[in-house]
Amino acid sequence: MKKIIATALIAGSAILGLSACTSDADVASENVSKAADNFEINRRIVFFNGITDKYLLEIQGRCSINADTASKKLDVTCKTKDGIKKHFLGLSDNVSYFMEQVDGANVSTDFYQVNFKPQAILPDIELR
């Protein structure tokens, strides 16, 4: 029992110590990313041909991105007044993208923002 308590104290101290080493910029960046994943940030995503310098596609709105580097694709999910729209965009040697945050975000640099979604945590239970 003493070993378990000692291990828990050491693990807790390590987590607390490592979290104290985080810079304000890292905390703000993490909070902006979480806000964007909750469709709170207005973004502009542009896909372009690196050889011809031509824009291929532009997506603007409250969008969340998920880069899948193994499959060389980018998933863009956007919230609109009519619902959710999702785009799958392939990347190649000559097609790339950049993303900009259109508006400023009011996020904290003092603490992490954690969002729990009950529907993701609790299973859907059917009673018969």
From Swiss-Prot:
Q: Which domain of life is it from?
A: Viruses
| UniProt-recorded name of the protein | Gene 64 protein
